[in-house]
Structure formats: structure tokens, C-alpha cells
A protein has these predicted regions:
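C-terminal outer-membrane/trafficking sorting elements
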Residues: 332-372
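Surface-exposed repetitive/solenoidal architectures
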Residues: 1-334
């Protein structure tokens, strides 16, 4: 079949300079779209930015579409069913087709959100998603870096039941891959597997977000899929990366899936935050899934895989789960000791949370971080 050009795609489009993005409203009214074929997957203009829409611009709205399993989407990078690149709003869309990126970033709904803007809400993915790196049920990831001054990315009320995997073992997650922004009330029931491939560093595997950066806020999310990877993996978040000094909060989330690793930083909620510059907190979260690792006897926990992750109030470890090395021994799971500025860690002093990171000391009120 002939490859159908994506709507809003320019042959010279780049992620940093997007031309001719769709800026109107497309209402599918619940109708089903079938027969879309994208099979060009080389590192060229034909192999990039392929989906139903190549790019949705800031004012663009695409909604009420069912993307059937009788579509074929295989492309080089930023691959999705509804959109390759999204700066606008995708709402109430469902995908049943399998999505494949031969290189970077595949999502069941959209490939990547860019330029600090983009919303995906009330969308559902049922297809399997694969990529070389970063395969996710809803969105492959979002653009970050010095050029982005405000992060207004949002994924809300979305579900994934497709299976996720990468060919080099890096970055699979149920909802989003490399991501900066907010994720609220999302659910993953698909199985996540990053154990295959040839990459030396197989990591960043999770039920909701594989790799978070720049003040991610994850609230009210649930994972019930099995999580299989090597290191930096969690039932909710795999790894929190270096970003700004704003706080990253994971709250009111539940993991019911088994989490199985082969190396360091394996946990039921958040695997690792060693490279984060701001406070990473876990509050009112529950882990009911068994957590195991064949390669570590130290950096493994039912809630966290690293002591740099602060455990707030209301966290619950499911009845019958084995006690792991990084499980809390007090209600907050925060050490009540004197501060040693030469060592990183999270402490409780005079009723306040204190985090020492990169030889800097911070006190935290709520989610606000103030350098002393």
C-alpha cells in the first residue's frame, strides 16, 4: 500500500523547528479510522514524524477518534497513532494498532510532546508498542532542556493495556517515557519488558514513567502490569534524572504489579533519584507488588530504591510482602540524625525534612524547596 502523508507534516520538519502543524479542530465523532500505512523507517524525511497527524500545533485539538488495528505504523522516531509531535490537545482517542519506532520514542497515542506544550487526556491504548529506546503506552516522551522555560505537558485520565518493550533495553513504561510535566489519574495494565537487547546499560523501566526530569508531578496513578528490567526500575517511576532544583512529587499512586530487576535501584514505587537536583518525594503511595532483584542486596525496596528519595506520610507496604533493605523503619522513613553536609541523604530535623544534595543543604515545606 502507498504510504499516506501525515496531516500537518512538512518534509523538512524538525523537532526544534516545526512547520505546518495542524492548528484547527478535528472531531472524529467516535468514528473508526482504518487503512493508514506508514512503513518508511529510515533516518530521512520519509521515515520521521509519521502518524495520522505529523504535528498538532498549540491551538490544535484532535478528539473522538478510534484508530483500528487495521492500521500499520512503523517509523524511525517520534512514532504514534494520532500524532507524531503534539503541542496541542489530543482528547478521547483510542488506539488498537501496534506502534513501532526503529529508533527513538514510540507512544500508543503520540510520539513526543514538544516546545513545553501538549495535553493528552481521556485516551486509551490497546496496541503493543516497541522502540529501540523509549516505548510507552500513551506518549513516547516530552522535549526538555534549556530552550524550554515552562513545562505545560499534561497526561490525564489515560489508560494503557498494550505491552511495552525496547530492543536495546532502555526506557519502556506504561504511560510515558522520558518525560517532564504532570501525569494524573492514569492506569497501566500492560506488561513492561526491558530485558532484551544489546545495550550495555539497560535501565529506566516503569509502570507509569520510565525517566522523569524537571519537576514531574505524578498523582493518582495505578500500575498492575509486570515490570521486568535490569536497573533503575519501579512500579511507578524508574528514574528521576538531573533537571532543575524544583521538587518531583509522586503521590496517591498504587503499584500492584511484580517488579523484577537484575541490578541496582529496584523498587515498588520509584527506583532511583541519585541524579536529581531537587527533592524527590513519595507520599500516600501503596505497593502491593513483589519486588525482586538478582543483582543487589542493598538498593532495593518496596517503596524506594535509593535513600535520596524522601518518604512522606501515608505510604503503605502490602501485607505479606517481604521486608526489603530500603523499607522504612519509622512512620516517615526519614533518618532522624544530625546533618552531615559531605554526604547526600534525606533527614528529619526539628520536625522538618532536610535534604543534602551535592553538598548543598535544603529544607522542604510541602513541595517547595529553599536553599539555606
Amino acid at each position: 500500500p502507498t504510504q499516506l502523508p501525515a496531516i500537518g507534516k512538512d518534509g523538512n520538519a524538525q523537532i526544534t523547528k516545526i512547520a505546518y502543524g495542524f492548528d484547527g479542530t478535528f472531531d472524529g465523532d467516535g468514528h473508526t479510522i482504518s487503512g493508514i500505512y506508514h512503513t518508511e523507517n529510515g533516518n530521512n524525511a520519509e521515515g520521521k514524524y509519521n502518524a495520522l497527524f505529523g504535528c498538532i500545533d498549540k491551538n490544535g485539538v484532535v478528539k473522538n477518534i478510534v484508530f483500528s488495528e487495521n492500521n500499520h505504523i512503523t517509523s524511525y522516531n517520534y512514532v504514534g497513532s494520532i500524532a507524531s509531535l503534539n503541542m496541542g490537545t489530543i482528547e478521547n482517542c483510542s488506539n488498537y494498532a501496534d506502534i513501532t519506532a526503529t529508533n527513538f520514542a514510540a507512544g500508543g497515542i503520540c510520539g513526543f510532546m514538544v516546545n513545553g506544550n501538549g495535553t493528552v487526556k481521556d485516551c486509551h491504548n490497546y496496541g503493543n508498542v516497541t522502540a529501540m529506546t523509549y516505548a510507552s503506552g500513551i506518549c513516547g516522551g516530552s522535549q526538555s532542556g534549556k530552550s524550554i522555560t515552562t513545562y505545560s505537558y499534561l497526561i490525564e485520565d489515560c489508560t494503557n493495556s498494550g505491552n511495552l518493550s525496547t530492543s536495546n533495553g532502555l526506557g519502556s513504561a506504561g504511560i510515558a517515557g522520558s518525560y517532564s510535566g504532570a501525569i494524573r489519574n492514569c492506569t497501566n495494565s500492560g506488561n513492561v519488558d526491558d530485558t532484551q537487547g544489546t545495550a550495555k546499560s539497560k535501565q529506566y523501566t516503569a509502570g507509569i514513567v520510565s525517566c522523569a526530569s524537571n519537576a514531574v508531578d505524578i498523582e493518582g496513578c495505578t500500575n498492575s502490569g509486570s515490570i521486568n528490567g535490569v536497573k533503575n526500575l519501579g512500579g511507578i517511576v524508574g528514574n528521576v534524572m538531573k533537571g532543575d532544583e524544583a521538587a518531583t512529587a509522586i503521590s496517591n499512586c498504587v503499584n500492584n504489579g511484580a517488579v523484577s530487576g537484575q541490578d541496582l535501584y529496584v523498587a515498588g514505587i520509584v527506583g532511583n533519584s541519585a541524579r536529581a537536583e531537587g527533592l524527590v518525594s513519595v507520599v500516600k503511595c501503596t505497593n502491593n507488588g513483589e519486588v525482586t532483584s538478582t543483582g543487589t542486596s542493598e538498593f532495593i525496596g518496596n517503596l524506594r530504591g535509593n535513600t535520596t528519595i524522601a518518604l512522606g506520610d501515608g505510604n503503605v507496604i502490602g501485607t505479606g510482602l517481604k521486608v526489603l533493605p530500603l523499607d522504612p523503619t519509622d512512620p516517615t522513613g526519614i533518618s532522624d540524625v544530625n546533618i552531615n553536609k559531605t554526604a547526600d541523604g534525606v533527614f528529619l530535623r526539628n520536625g522538618k525534612i532536610v535534604i543534602v544534595k551535592n553538598n548543598k543543604e535544603y529544607t522542604v515545606g510541602g513541595v517547595q524547596m529553599v536553599e539555606k
